[in-house]
Amino acid sequence: MRSASIGYQCPECASDSTPVIRGISKNSFIPNQENNQATKFLSITLISIYVAQFVLGDILISNFALFAPSVSTGQWWRLITAGFLHGSILHLLFNVYILWVIGSQLESIVGNVKFIIIYFLSLLGGSLASYWFSPFGSYSIGASGAIFGLMGAMLVVGRKKRLDISQIAVLVILNVVIGFVLSGIDWRAHLGGLAAGSLIAWVLLNATWLKEKNQQ
């Protein structure tokens, strides 16, 4: 079983709390809770499903994890449902923590609808990358593709809005490197989610900019 946890953070980030703009602080690990309903819902959902896993045993893994042979026979839902399963309590907590911190910030900037679009397309992008490039008979679970997508989106949005994104960039780099160094981590899902989230955020931002420009 391969899990794709996000389990590390930037140790320097806790020492500086100087505010920047739009609720983003130099300490990128303080969430903005002004408009994070979708983040709350997703966090509660991930925790609730893990409780169900604990109660039901391996039945959810067997039927909903990303397993390429099953996907290839038509069980396409696994590309999404795998992102709601976790291999351990630490796997879950790491992903929920990053979801809460990065997701709350991103959602407060782009809004609920765009945030949800970014989350689910990042999840799908990570799953597709894992499906296409991982060994054919391997299992993969975890929200990490979506989480990496949120981090990629935050980099794109932050740069567009001239925010301090240095600490998020460090977080992304650290976790990408860790994915290659440690065994049992689905780095393909990480990179797929990161690419998808960055691309979707760029498209959404530019679509909004073009719409506003045409209305002037």
Q: Language-model segments: which ranges?
A:
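A detector for small-residue-rich transmembrane helices and their helix-helix packing motifs
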Residues: 2-216
